[in-house]
């Protein structure tokens, strides 16, 4: 099967691009996206329709699937949402177009892609994957025809994992292939054959060969069940036809993964080799589910068991790695497969949370890569030797412009300062000539140093000093303004720190609403005073700006400075009060003061419990931040924003009020420490005990309700059994008395009873046919044993004495139908043989049919079997023909000929014809299925046994 390969770049000469390799456009093509998950619900199969299985799942819309079956024992979700949901009427082409096409076509642009088919056995995985693969091949070659500027090479390789052994599907003679770890390619399969597809027909031929070589077997659920995992890998390489400076090509893998279905041995009845295959399949699928579940969780740092299975090891890149992945989950809507369907939906729910990191895989040959790098080095060397004058001159000009703009700004600032100084000097010279009597600047030397305005009446001896001071006053405004700004900055810092301290205290008091009232009032006063100081200061700032604009003198500046000094002193005094208020508030908080020195385990436990109950704003975590003085000089360099952020917001006061019932607050602890120590500690424990008692009472009440419901159900069943036993005893007595004829009175009574039961031959025949038809309908609805049906149908043929049996059977089936309607499809508890359900009836009927199918080999000859196969239209090439024949018996309750033939075949298989005359009231003592112990599925046999035991005791 070898095919000549065209010349291409060897694998050893290909350098794969890393995760952050830039694209020609300059950006990295690393794409993060989640797995695209779709769910396809198949229609009911022929076997499920023959067993009258119910539909339990419906597609609400194209993204939601709903559970419509009877309620389950355990709590489970009733609706699931996915990227796409396809109902039973959807076609495979639609599934491919909306669920897998986008992922499959990404392989043509250099992105790895994988398409999974996951689901239980006989759910339609292989059917779906065949259609998806065929559609993908058509689209790939259609894209190749529409892209003439690129050359494409399609390579195919295929493998199957059968019993954890990797085999090459293109080489049937291949043995167990080893898995190797490659640092660049990941996990590879050693000696795996890879063929180059010449065209689409050749590729389809190779795919068909792979499907023929796959392991297929027969199970009870599927005649052609896939017994291995199949992986068909298409490697797509493309390169430009035109030769460029650095020829790049794309390479990507497209995997079509058809998984084997999960199965239960109880349903497939697998033994021997089939059981071994099922064990390996379930083990590998369990590993796949574990990997998906761990990848879907938030914490992906833990160990992910890729190497626990060869399936997950080969597909590691497709699971959370460098690939785009689409998963098509197939499921059956039947009620009998509800648990397997839920497991499939759980897998799909986890899979849609897995994130892959897909990238474009570009490869460059070594020869052309070296040539490209040499050209790049030559270009850089040329730039270093002859720098670009234009670019360098532009940079120099921009730098000079920036410096010029900066110098212009500085010159404008200097001009403003010069103008202000000249203005101040002119005002000073003008006011020095004014006469101001009553004030002598030389009376107070300190005042002379602070004030720079002088009167006109000066002594001649001091005129020279005044002239020198005037010459020096030109630089005084700058120094004075600098000092004023320093003082203003100090005041602002103190105000900011005071406000922060007040906010901290205010929030703490808000958390303790019933706290110290004195501290709260002090804080409110301090806040009002600081706001007043800020408003006054803002007014002064406005006045200062206005006065500076109008040319105010330095005397007003100095007076304002004195007032600011007084304000700063007042502010410092107020901040001292704030510090003392902080200390008092901290000492009044719980677990502070003398309680901090308690080291007993009991107190420590109480503190821990209280700390857990209190919100974050009043916890002990933030109390050390309150003890530090926010107004101290060292605190100015320490930011307080993290401390404020760690406190509870104002909106949390409601939650704190709700927790006051369980947490002792400051209002409960008013007084000294000793009063808090004397508070009884059993209050909190009593509240906890009350909660425990309430929980115990609730659990006890629920348990009592369940016990009462079970007891009532058991009583109903016992009453029904006693009623049937009573009626059967009456039948036995009537028949014995009529046969023996002991007394005339009893004979007259029996004749009267017989007379009362009949009005005429025609009416009784008509009534018997109607009741028998009603019984047959109920047999079919309740899935009653076909052995019981045959026995009853052959024994009671319309005799007037049979009316009591007919009536008892009608009542029994009516009660059974009502019981199924009430119980639903709930499975009986372990060890409870008296509780039955519709599911248990179906299971017992299925086991009975299998029992009869096995008896056909010993009870019927080969010629009889062949005649029956032809008569019942069982195909000659069909699998399990005997079971198919038995499954067709007693399936049409409206066809009288069908019922007669079914009863005849069952009677021959069980041996009714060999027993001779059988007593009607003991009709099912000899021909019951020994495996079943449920009385209502067995018909009347257990009741008859109980009657016989009672009569022997009497």
UniProtKB/Swiss-Prot annotation:
The protein's matches in PROSITE patterns, at most eight in alphabetical order, are given as:
KINESIN_MOTOR_2
Task: Please provide the Gene Ontology terms (biological process) for this protein.
Answer: cell division; microtubule-based movement
| Region (Disordered) residue spans | 1-29, 624-689, 741-762
Question: What is this protein's tissue specificity according to the annotation?
Answer: Ubiquitous with a preferential expression in the shoot apical meristem (SAM).
Q: Which InterPro entries match?
A: Kinesin-like_fam, Kinesin_motor_dom, Kinesin_motor_dom_sf, NACK_C, P-loop_NTPase
Question: Where are the coiled-coil regions?
Answer: 363-436, 480-588
Q: Which residues form the Kinesin motor domain?
A: 34-354
Q: Does the keyword Ion transport apply?
A: no
Q: Name one GO molecular function term.
A: microtubule binding
Spell out the Low complexity composition-biased ranges. Answer: 17-28, 630-639
Q: Describe its function.
A: May be essential to promote the progression of cytokinesis during node-internode differentiation.
Name used for this protein in its record:
Kinesin-like protein KIN-7A
> Whose protein is this, by species?
Oryza sativa subsp. japonica
């Amino acid at each position: 099967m070898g095919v000549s390969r065209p010349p291409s770049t060897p694998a050893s000469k290909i350098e794969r691009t890393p995760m952050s390799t830039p694209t020609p456009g300059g950006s990295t093509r690393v794409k993060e996206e989640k797995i695209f998950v779709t769910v396809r619900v198949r229609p009911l199969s022929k076997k499920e329709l023959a067993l009258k299985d119910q539909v339990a799942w419906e597609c609400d819309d194209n993204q939601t699937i709903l559970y419509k079956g009877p309620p389950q024992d355990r709590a489970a979700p009733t609706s699931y949402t996915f990227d796409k949901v396809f109902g039973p009427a959807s076609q495979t082409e639609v599934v491919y177009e909306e669920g897998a096409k986008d992922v499959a076509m990404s392989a043509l642009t250099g992105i790895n892609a994988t398409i999974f088919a996951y689901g239980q056995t006989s759910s339609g995985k292989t059917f779906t994957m065949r259609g998806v693969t065929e559609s993908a091949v058509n689209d790939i070659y259609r894209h190749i025809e529409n892209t003439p500027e690129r050359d494409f090479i399609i390579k195919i390789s295929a493998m199957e994992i059968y019993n954890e052994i990797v085999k090459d599907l293109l080489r049937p003679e291949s043995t167990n292939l080893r898995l190797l770890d490659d640092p660049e390619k990941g996990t590879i399969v050693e000696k795996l054959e890879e063929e180059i597809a010449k065209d689409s027909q050749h590729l389809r031929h190779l795919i068909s060969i792979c499907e023929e070589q796959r392991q297929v077997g027969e199970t009870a659920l599927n005649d052609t069940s896939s017994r291995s995992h199949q992986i068909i890998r298409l490697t797509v390489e493309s390169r430009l036809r035109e030769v460029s400076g650095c020829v790049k090509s794309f390479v990507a893998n497209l995997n079509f993964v058809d998984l084997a279905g999960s199965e239960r041995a109880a349903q497939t009845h697998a033994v021997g080799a089939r059981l071994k295959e099922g064990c390996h399949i379930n083990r590998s699928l369990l590993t796949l589910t574990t990997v998906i579940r761990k990848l879907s969780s938030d914490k992906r740092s833990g160990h992910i068991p890729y190497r626990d299975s060869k399936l997950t090891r080969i597909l590691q890149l497709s699971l959370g790695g460098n690939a785009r992945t689409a998963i098509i989950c197939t499921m059956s809507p039947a009620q009998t497969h509800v648990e397997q369907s839920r497991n499939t939906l759980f897998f799909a729910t986890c899979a849609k949370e897995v994130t892959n990191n897909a990238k474009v895989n570009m490869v460059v040959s070594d020869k052309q890569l070296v040539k490209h790098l040499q050209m790049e080095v030559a270009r850089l060397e040329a730039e270093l030797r002859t720098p670009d004058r234009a670019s360098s001159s532009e940079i120099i000009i921009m730098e000079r412009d920036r410096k010029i703009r900066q110098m212009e700004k500085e010159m404008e600032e200097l001009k403003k300062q010069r103008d202000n100084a000249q203005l101040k000097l002119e005002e000073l010279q003008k006011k020095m000539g004014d006469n101001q009597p009553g004030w002598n600047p030389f009376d107070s030397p300190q005042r002379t140093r602070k004030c720079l305005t002088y009167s006109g009446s000066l002594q001649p001896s001091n005129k020279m000093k005044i002239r020198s001071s005037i010459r020096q006053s030109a630089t005084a405004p700058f120094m004075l303004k600098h000092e004023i700004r320093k003082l203003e900055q100090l005041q602002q810092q103190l105000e900011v720190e005071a406000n922060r301290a007040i906010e901290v205290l205010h929030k703490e008091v808000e958390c303790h609403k019933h706290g110290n009232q004195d501290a709260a009032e002090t804080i409110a006063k301090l806040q009002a005073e600081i706001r007043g100081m800020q408003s006054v200061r803002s007014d002064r700032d406005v006045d200062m700006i206005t006065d500076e604009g109008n040319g105010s003198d330095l005397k007003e500046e100095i007076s304002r400075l004195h007032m600011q000094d007084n304000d700063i002193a007042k502010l410092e005094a107020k901040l001292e009060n704030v510090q003392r208020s902080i200390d008092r508030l901290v000492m009044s908080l719980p677990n502070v003061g003398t309680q901090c020195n308690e080291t007993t385990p009991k107190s420590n436990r109480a503190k821990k419990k209280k700390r857990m109950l209190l919100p974050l704003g009043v916890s002990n975590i933030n109390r050390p931040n309150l003890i530090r003085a926010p107004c101290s000089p060292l605190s100015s360099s320490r930011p307080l924003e993290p401390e404020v952020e760690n406190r509870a917001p104002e909106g949390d006061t409601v939650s704190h009020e709700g927790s006051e019932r369980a947490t002792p607050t400051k209002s409960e602890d008013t007084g000294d420490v000793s009063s808090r120590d004397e508070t009884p500690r059993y209050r909190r424990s009593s509240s906890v005990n009350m909660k425990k008692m309430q929980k115990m009472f609730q659990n006890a009440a629920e348990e009592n309700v369940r016990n009462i419901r079970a007891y009532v159900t058991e009583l109903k069943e016992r009453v029904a059994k006693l009623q049937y036993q009573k009626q059967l005893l009456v039948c036995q007595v009537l028949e014995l008395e009529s046969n023996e004829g002991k007394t005339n009175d009893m004979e007259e009574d029996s004749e009267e009873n017989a007379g009362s039961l009949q009005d005429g031959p025609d009416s009784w025949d008509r009534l018997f046919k109607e009741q028998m038809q009603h019984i047959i309908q109920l047999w079919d609805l309740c899935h009653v044993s076909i052995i019981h049906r045959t026995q009853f149908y052959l024994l009671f043929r319309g005799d007037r004495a049979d009316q009591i049996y007919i009536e008892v059977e009608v009542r029994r089936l009516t009660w059974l139908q009502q019981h199924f309607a009430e119980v639903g499809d709930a499975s009986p508890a372990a060890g409870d043989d008296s509780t039955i359900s519709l599911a248990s009836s179906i299971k017992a009927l299925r086991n009975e049919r299998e029992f009869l199918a096995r008896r056909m080999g010993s009870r019927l000859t080969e010629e009889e079997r062949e005649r029956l196969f032809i008569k019942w239209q069982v195909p000659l090439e069909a699998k399990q023909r005997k079971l198919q024949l038995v499954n067709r018996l007693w399936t049409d309750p409206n066809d009288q000929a069908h019922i007669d033939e079914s009863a005849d075949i069952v009677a021959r298989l069980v041996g009714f014809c060999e027993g001779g005359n059988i007593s009607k009231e003991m009709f099912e003592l000899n021909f019951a299925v020994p495996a079943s112990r449920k009385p209502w599925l067995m018909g009347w046999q257990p009741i008859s046994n109980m009657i016989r035991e009672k009569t022997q005791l009497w």
